[in-house]
Amino acid sequence: IYTLSLHDALPISSLYYLGKVDEAKKIQQIRSAMRAYDEENVFTTHRGMILVERQIGHATRYGLMAAIDLEAYDYTRASTSWIRATEGTVAERIPPRMKIREGAPLELPHILVLVDDTEKLLIEPLVAIRDTLPVVYDFDLMMGSGHIRGYSLADGEIERRVLAAIDRLQSDETLAKKYGPLNERNRILFAIGDGNHSLATAKEIWEKNKKTWGPDHPARYAMVELENLHDAAQEFEPIHRIVLGLSGSLKNALADEFGGTVSFEPFANREALFAAVDATKDGVQSFGLIEDGEFVKVTFAEPRSALCVGSVQQFLDQLRKAGFFKEVDYLHGTEELSALSDVKGNAGIYLPPVQKNGFFEGIIKDGALPRKTFSMGEAQEKRFYIEARRIL
């Protein structure tokens, strides 16, 4: 699998070097390798969906490999499609990826798509019968990344059950129960958790060629792994902010902007502050502010976004436009956040874990979540390039 990926894919870091003299040569090598592997039967062909079991440390995460219809996907912020982006899509990142995908006979996806399945209708019933299913692959992953196993779902009755579950998730009754009175914004089924720019690339290529290819062409669809947002092993890590080069007090700027709708609670140290923010109740938006040696829990009484990170980011964007600070950096851990917050003229923003119950509501209300809202696990928990699908 490792060798196949190196020959059949271009590492994301290499995208920034496209335009150099070896660009066409490298892309041609990828296409040639794909065709050779296909013609020489390097791949084992399977039809139908696959149940994926990924063991990572103490947890086991499940997913459903399937193909989604790109006609039902729109990555723009104003999207009202059934399938939407979670974060804003950077248009400039799409053309380099199009150069690679266009003309490629295969796709090797790493795309993770989330479903807001609180009743566990779609994937969990498949997990319950996995011991009766044929195993497609079963092996350890490299560099401490755990173990992966795939089960074939190429059975007519199982496929009917999957489609019935999707129909129920799309039903007016289910949607109204989760999101309130129906409108064009809250008719949503899937949200892209990881790999949105890759999926946006597939969408653009399909839109460019669909009149020539026709509605039944395989490139109308893109293979992804569907995962339940409410899987206990699906962990969303918050991404904190460090505000650099402030021209004034961030705490005072918050008070000026929000007035009586924001409150400040001081703590003796950063550990107590972090614990208090982590313990924030569902439906309440609070974050930690570290500035000038103070440790303050900030709470919005009238939040301006569905998620706390959205309310914070909107405020920071306003201040950036006003020239109130030099830049914002995004940090995953607390050690660097703490160290940088101690520098004069900086302020650290410690964000709470993303509340799963408000995740889809954030997409519905705001169109897309703010950049750097969350991280889906550590590096060794990311999806590997394992499955391929013919698209030309």
Language-model regions, residue ranges each:
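C-terminal amphipathic alpha-helical segment
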Residues: 231-296
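N-terminal extension/subdomain marker
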Residues: 1-146, 150, 154, 176-180, ...
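Glycine-rich phosphate-binding "P-loop"
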Residues: 142-165, 300, 304
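A short, acidic, amphipathic alpha-helical segment used as a generic capping/interface helix at domain edges
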Residues: 165, 169-173, 271-280, 329-344
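Long, compositionally biased intrinsically disordered regions
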Residues: 1-9, 23-31, 284-392
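Active-site beta-strand/loop microenvironment that shapes enzyme catalytic pockets
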Residues: 168-212
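A general structural signal for short secondary-structure junctions and capping/turn motifs
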Residues: 42, 53-57, 98-106, 181-184, ...
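Catalytic or ion-translocation cores adjacent to nucleophile or general acid/base/metal-coordination motifs
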Residues: 194-257
